[in-house]
Amino acid sequence: MKLLTLNTHSLIEPDYEAKREAFVDFIAEEQPEVFALQEVNQTAAAPLLGDVPEGYYPCPDNTVQLKEDNHAAAVARMLEERGVHYDWSWLPAKVGYDKYDEGMAVFSRAPITDAENLLLSKTSDYSNWKTRRALGVCAGDVWYYTVHLGWWKDEEEPFAAQWEKLSQAAGAKQTAFLLGDFNSEADVRGEGYDLILC
């Protein structure tokens, strides 16, 4: 099984269009069973997306509508144009850089049959950049979560508390894979990486 995870930075990434094109070409060639993306943005003030690409599975309790520059929708459409189909879901977590709906997406070759919107941070304030969520999708009998966790030393929204919520939710599933940007350096002992390995 091929799994891939990437923090895309999407709309704020320098040379965004060229990098998106290269990424979609890579996905079309490698065709991982599942890929998970973080910092999947859309401009909050952009017009609503007209035709939603095939395979979209709305995440429960998401009230933010897809906009025409949504990165996940663009990736789905570009894959369609290459004859590659994925089911996909997108969940915004917060306002990023004062102008983006910033969130996560999961793409699956197998049909998505369920999705979960999991609040990981103490705050649920959409305008607070420290708000953290996980997007989980079920494909077959397996759950795949994409996350973008906070930092270990954040006193307001500590990594350890977010990890505890995520591990409890994923642990309740028969089989679950955790993908994402954990904001934890592997060479730093006694912090996030070690906690994940416990």
Predicted regions and their residues:
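Active-site regions of metal-assisted phosphoester/phosphodiester hydrolases
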Residues: 1-34, 58-59, 73, 80-81, ...
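Aromatic- and glycine-enriched glycan-recognition loops and surfaces
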Residues: 67-73
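Active-site neighborhood of divalent metal-dependent phosphoester/pyrophosphate hydrolases
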Residues: 11, 39-53, 58-66, 184
